[in-house]
Swiss-Prot record:
Binds 1 Mn(2+) ion per subunit. Catalyzes the conversion of L-arabinose to L-ribulose. Homohexamer. Pathway: Carbohydrate degradation; L-arabinose degradation via L-ribulose; D-xylulose 5-phosphate from L-arabinose (bacterial route): step 1/3. It comes from Serratia proteamaculans (strain 568). This is L-arabinose isomerase. Belongs to the arabinose isomerase family. SUPFAM superfamilies: FucI/AraA C-terminal domain-like, FucI/AraA N-terminal and middle domains. Its EC number is 5.3.1.4. GO terms for molecular function: L-arabinose isomerase activity; manganese ion binding. Its cofactor is Mn(2+). The keyword Metal-binding applies.
Length: 501
């Protein structure tokens, strides 16, 4: 995806002229060394760009305004090397719209016991300079993140990298366009919601298009382009007998390829990065898009079934966040349970649309099987299982007065038995802390049946995403108990009612 290409985080150093030019020169030299080291050795996904030292209110305000207007800048990392009186930051922070991270570090890792003098103390004042900066953020009620630790500490590197990923995802969300092919599945509640409110909160736009608009683009796809794509299928997947040349369903594969090319062309022409479909809106299409949706998700597009635009947008945003990390990220649905004492499991899947980025098999099976839902021809789909490992399920829901991000930590397991008659991709997991507690908590919180499933991301990154957007975050994990979770729901309700703007 190259999600972080041409992105940068501005590294800002705050100080004041009180200390004199020699001290400020040392601060600049230290900053250059820190930024150079972090860019070379910390494995950060986004480049740090050192900005000129800011020592006056006007310089700080100019920096913050410039950050807002430069599209390559996804946020500011601030280091208070010396004491920078925080009233100087009020005007700048008041206009700053990009994410802010305070890196509470200092140049030296240890105190030089034998040589430390007052010059050293004046130069290395992060310990209290950072507190002054933190106060003004708290006083202004401004959302910002804080990471404390030495700049050579791998844990600090990891956390800065996570913050960069979330800041990049936030910017991607602000630029995101979601196309809905058709409307919401009739009478379904949770997939609907306030699209205007979402655009105000997150920045992404959601617009619907008649299925005929898509069909007209699909019908323009040439046979030569279809044949080229089918050659790619044959190189990438294990084709079932029905899908092979002269197979009983070969024409269905041709139709699926034409649908994929048409959908991608439509999305590219409109600069959409996420989309939804609905099996109730298929007029003019030969089959429900399955293979097309799976492959588009693997290329980085967000997707939601049955018109679920919130999950489509969230999937795209989390794919940006996860770019380059080990593990995949997919549209998902809790489909059925396996109740067994000591071994309760959830089978996650969907009618067709599970992203191959989570596939365990190097070459998934490409098959064509009947699908009663939608009333169309048998659709092509990729069939695979998912590797074992930790994962999260995330659901963004509209609570009317606010958005809520609900996350359940799960442990994916290897498929324990063959599923010879199940013609869809799937993931199987143990919900934390138990299936019963996780399901009850999820239902009490109003979590959707659609989720984003990710083996690349963790709950900390999703919590940070929620914090950057000032939305509610609820976590169901190994430490969750139902009485405490119910209390959290009550407390949150009171907080958000009192904090309404």
């Amino acid at each position: 995806m190259n999600a972080f290409k041409q992105r940068e985080v501005w590294f800002a150093i705050g100080s004041q002229h009180l200390y004199g030019p020699q001290t400020l020169q040392q601060v600049k030299a230290h900053a250059e060394q820190v930024v150079d080291s972090l860019n070379r050795e910390a494995g950060l996904p986004v480049k740090l760009v050192l900005k000129p030292l800011v020592t006056t209110p006007d310089e700080i305000t100019a920096l913050c305004r410039d950050a807002n207007y430069q599209p390559q800048c996804i946020g500011i990392l601030a280091w208070l090397h010396t004491f920078s009186p925080a009233k100087m930051w009020i005007a700048g922070l008041s206009v700053l719209h990009k994410p802010l991270l305070q890196f509470h570090t200092q140049f030296n890792a240890q105190v030089p016991w034998d040589s430390m003098d007052m010059d050293f103390m004046n130069l290395n004042q992060t310990a209290h300079g950072g507190r002054e900066f933190g106060f003004i953020g708290a006083r202004m009620r401004q959302q910002h993140s804080v990471i404390a630790g030495h700049w050579q500490d791998p844990e600090a590197h990891r956390r800065i990298g996570q913050w960069m990923r979330v800041a990049s995802a936030k910017q991607a969300g602000q630029q995101l366009k979601v196309a809905r092919f058709g409307d919401n599945m009739r009478e379904v509640a949770v997939t609907d919601g306030d699209k205007v409110g979402a655009q105000i909160q997150f920045g992404y736009s959601v617009n619907a298009y008649g299925i005929g608009d898509l069909v007209s683009v699909i019908n323009e796809v040439s046979r030569g382009d279809v044949d080229t794509l089918i050659e790619e299928y044959e190189a990438s997947y294990v084709l079932s007998d029905a899908a092979k040349i002269n197979g009983a369903k070969r024409e269905n594969l041709t139709d699926a390829a034409r649908i994929e090319l048409g959908m991608k062309r439509f999305l590219e022409q409109g600069n959409f990065q996420a989309f939804t479909t609905n099996f109730e809106d298929l007029h003019g299409m030969k089959q429900l898009p399955g293979l097309a949706v799976q492959r588009l998700m693997q290329q980085g597009y967000g997707f939601g079934g049955e018109g679920d635009w919130k999950t489509a947008a969230l999937l795209r945003i989390l794919k940006v966040m996860a770019d380059g990390l080990h593990g995949g990220t997919s549209f998902m649905e809790d489909y059925t349970y396996h109740f067994q004492p000591g071994n309760d499991l959830v089978v996650g899947s969907h009618m067709l649309e599970v992203c191959p980025s989570i596939a365990r098999e190097p070459k998934p099976l490409l098959d064509i099987q009947p699908l009663g839902i939608g009333g169309k021809a048998d659709p092509a789909r990729l069939i695979f299982s998912t590797p074992a490992g930790p994962a999260v399920n995330a659901s963004l829901i509209d609570m009317g007065d606010r958005f809520r991000l609900l996350v359940n930590q799960v442990d994916t397991v290897e498929q324990p038995h063959p599923l010879p008659k199940l013609p869809v991709a799937r993931a199987i997991w143990r919900a934390q802390p138990t299936l019963a507690t996780a399901a009850e908590a999820w239902i009490l919180a109003g979590g959707a049946h659609h989720t984003v499933f990710s083996q690349a991301l963790d709950a900390d990154m999703l919590r940070l995403y929620a914090e950057m957007h000032n939305i509610e975050f609820l976590l169901i994990d190994q430490d969750t108990t139902l009485p405490a979770f119910k209390n959290e729901l009550r407390w949150n309700e009171a907080y958000y009612q009192l904090n309404r703007r």
